[in-house]
Amino acid sequence: MANKTVLFNKHLESDAKMVDFHGWDMPLNYGSQIEEHNAVRQDAGMFDVSHMTVVDVTGTDACAFLRKLLANDVAKLKVPGKALYGGMLDHNAGVIDDLITYYLTDTHYRVVVNSATREKDLAWIAEQVKGFDVEIVERPELAMIAVQGPNAKAKAATVFNDAQNAAVEGMKPFFGVQADSLFIATTGYTGETGYEIIVPEDEAQALWQGLLEAGVKPCGLGARDTLRLEAGMNLYGLDMDETVNPLAANMGWTIAWEPQDRDFNGREALAAIKAAGTEKLVGLIMEAKGVIRPGMSVFFTDGEGVEQQGTITSGTFSPTLGYSIAMARVPRSIGDTAEVEMRKKRVSVKVVAPSFVRNGKQAF
C-alpha cells in the first residue's frame, strides 16, 4: 500500500492524476502540467509536499552536532528563523541528501529532508548523533504546503490570521517563523517568491481549501519538476547522490571551508577531490526541436582538441522559454558550446550557468 498524505482526498476533488512517488500516492497533475507551471510563473500555485520529512534537532549539543553532520555551517545562523541550504555528506564526500536547516534557538534546529531518502537519512543521523547531547525527533504529524508565484504571498495573506500576517511581514527570503499553529518559511523549489508552510495534519485540509478559494492553483509533481529545473535547482537522485561530490553538483557555494578546524563529515575526502579537480554541473539550452532527457550523452572538444564526454542529469522542455533545457555533469574543460546525442544524431547546444529562469524571467 502506498502512503497517502492528509491531502489525498483534496487532490481527488480537484481531479488529480495520481502516481506513485517513492512509495507515496502523489498528484502528477490536475489536468494540465503546462497550465500549472505557468500559474506559478505568472500568478500563484500550490503543492502538497507533506511527503517531505521534518526533523527537529534539540539539545545542548544541537549546534555542534549539525556542524559535524552538514557541509554548510549552522554557526553562521545568528538570527532566529534563518535557514541554510546544504549537503549531508558521507565520509567519502558523497551527497547523502540535500536539505534545509532552520535555526530556531541555540538548542533547537529544524531540518527538512527529502522523502525518497527518509530512511537512509534518519539511519545516518542516528549513527552520527552518538556522543552528542541531542534529541532527534521526526514530526510525521506535520503536513506541508508550498505556495509559490508572484501573487502567492498576497493570496496566502487572505488565508492567514492577523497574527500570522504580522509574523511574516517584511520577512526576508530563507527565513521561517512559527505563527500560531503554522510554521511559515520564505523558501521554495520553483525560483519564485512564496512560502513553504508546515501545518498540523488536522488543519492541512482547511488551509488547502482556503488557498484554493483564494485563487491558488493546485500543482502536481510534473510542474514541480519543470519549475525547479528552470530555476537550476538540483533533484536528489538525478543531479546528485552518494556517488557524486557536491563540487560536481553545483553545490560548491554550500561548502563552509572556514573555520578550518571544523571537522565536518567528508571534509578530508572533499579537500582531496577539490585539489585533484572534479567534474562540474552546467546548464544546456537547445533551441532546435526535441527534448533533452536524463542519461543522454554530451560531447565537446576541449582546448587541446581532445573530444570529451559528459552526461545529462536532468532535462525537459521549458514552458517559460519555449525550448529544451538540461543540466549535465561534464569535464571542467567545457566551453560555451557542445553537442547532445539524440536519436543517433548529434545536436548543437549552448552551455550556460545552471539557472535558466528566476522570478519569471530568463536568467542567463
From Swiss-Prot:
Can the keyword Translocase be found in this entry's annotation? Answer: no
The protein's annotated catalytic reaction(s) are: N(6)-[(R)-S(8)-aminomethyldihydrolipoyl]-L-lysyl-[protein] + (6S)-5,6,7,8-tetrahydrofolate = N(6)-[(R)-dihydrolipoyl]-L-lysyl-[protein] + (6R)-5,10-methylene-5,6,7,8-tetrahydrofolate + NH4(+)
User: What molecular functions are annotated in GO for this chain?
Assistant: aminomethyltransferase activity; transaminase activity
Keywords on record: Aminotransferase, Transferase
Q: By its UniProt entry, which InterPro entries does this protein fall under?
A: GCS_T, GCS_T_bac, GCST_C, GCV_T_N, GcvT/YgfZ/DmdA, GcvT/YgfZ_C, TrmE/GcvT_dom1
Q: Which residues form a coiled coil?
A: none
Pfam families associated with the record: GCV_T, GCV_T_C
Q: Name one GO biological process term.
A: glycine decarboxylation via glycine cleavage system
**One Gene Ontology CC term in the entry:** cytosol
Q: Which EC numbers characterise this protein's activity in its record?
A: 2.1.2.10
**Transferase as a keyword?**
yes
Q: Which NCBIfam families match?
A: gcvT, PRK00389.1
Q: Note the PANTHER family from the entry.
A: AMINOMETHYLTRANSFERASE (PTHR43757), AMINOMETHYLTRANSFERASE, MITOCHONDRIAL (PTHR43757:SF2)
Q: How does it assemble?
A: The glycine cleavage system is composed of four proteins: P, T, L and H.
Checking HAMAP family in the record gives: GcvT (MF_00259)
Question: What exactly does this protein do?
Answer: The glycine cleavage system catalyzes the degradation of glycine.
Q: Which family does it belong to?
A: Belongs to the GcvT family.
Q: What is this protein called?
A: Aminomethyltransferase
The organism encoding this protein is Shewanella sediminis (strain HAW-EB3)
Task: Quote the gene name from the UniProt entry.
Answer: gcvT
